[in-house]
Amino acid sequence: VSGHITVPAGKFLTIEEGVQVIFDDKGVGANHVPVEFTVDGNLYCKGTAENPVLFSVAEENRTKENTFAGLWGGIVASNSCEEMLIDHTVIEYTGGQVVEGSPAAANGVYTAGDDAYPQITTNNIKGKYVITNSVLRNGWSDGIYLMGGQAIIAGNTFAANGYDGAEAVNVKAGCTVDVAGNIMFSPNTNGLKLSSSGQSETRGQAKVQAYNNTIVNAGWRRDGEKGGCVYAEKNVLANVFNNLMVNCKFRAMTPSFKNPNDPEEGYSDQSVIDYNFYASGSQKSDIVYEEESGVAYAWAGYNYEHKNYNSGVVDVHSIIATENDLKDPLFENFAVNEVALTEYVYDEGWDFHVKSGSPVLAGANSGTDANLVPYFSTNGLSVNGVIYHSPAVKAQFGAFGLK
């Protein structure tokens, strides 16, 4: 594909299993505008485990050196996109810079010269989005950037999201989202950045249930320090529980928590960010900012007296590693003490199920409290005539229990 793709408003495109959409990395026109996949109508990507849909670049360009090269734009669901399904789909090598001539700049979604494309963008507060069983990897910017809509984000693998900033999942005002059962490996900053930034009379409070996710190696690659697994701010109602953080730089942060319920300041004080499990390896990071926190080990970051830790409120019941008790989750196949904290290449041989006797199998929240029930577990979300349900809460930490 050497030109921009647009699904027109009022139309839909179905991409069947096994289809590969290969983007030209040279861009469009004399300005080399990164190729963008614009969804003004509806998009249904219907891959299978055996035959996923693929959005990528030419095979010879799928290299480690190009992990953050931003070889094409990304999928941009505009404010006229009513619904989108991304199931069993691989999206990789995205993150081209938004420039003059980029459709997203012309449409006012992003600003030319200031933004890079996430893998997936949404921008319709009335939209419905289901992103499941997919792989979002190797991108300059965020994996998913939600600026509107109802969404289920479940059972996905995120890897190497963000070159010098960015998150796996980034939520803004106008969204109601369940984020569950995902693996998030080496997001540049956070696995979850949750904010009600942009809230207005028409764009409502961001509401997020984030549970049973496994976040690994978050925060270490960032140029400077800002978060390191979960970051909740600006009046977001965020219930973040039963997640497993492994070798992340910091614990959950809630900046400006002394000024809650303010779209310009702190998160909603009705949020529950607790009952999480913070595991650490013994290895030292090869990137340490001595002039900032000086944190060089995951356990040190978890126990650092950070100004954005809302002590006594956040993580009161969480299980937190220390230097002398690293809380090894006992994964089936992941060397928690060996994989470099700044590693971003995902090994398909890893297995984040846990072995019998793993400490992540005890101490989690039952999830039965009314305020912790997923938004779309009962009635679900209807996309293309099919009802999709969020996963039920599991009384364990992380995405996977016993194999």
Enumerate the language-model features and the residues they cover:
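Extracellular beta-rich repeat passengers
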Residues: 1-8, 12-16, 24-41, 48, ...
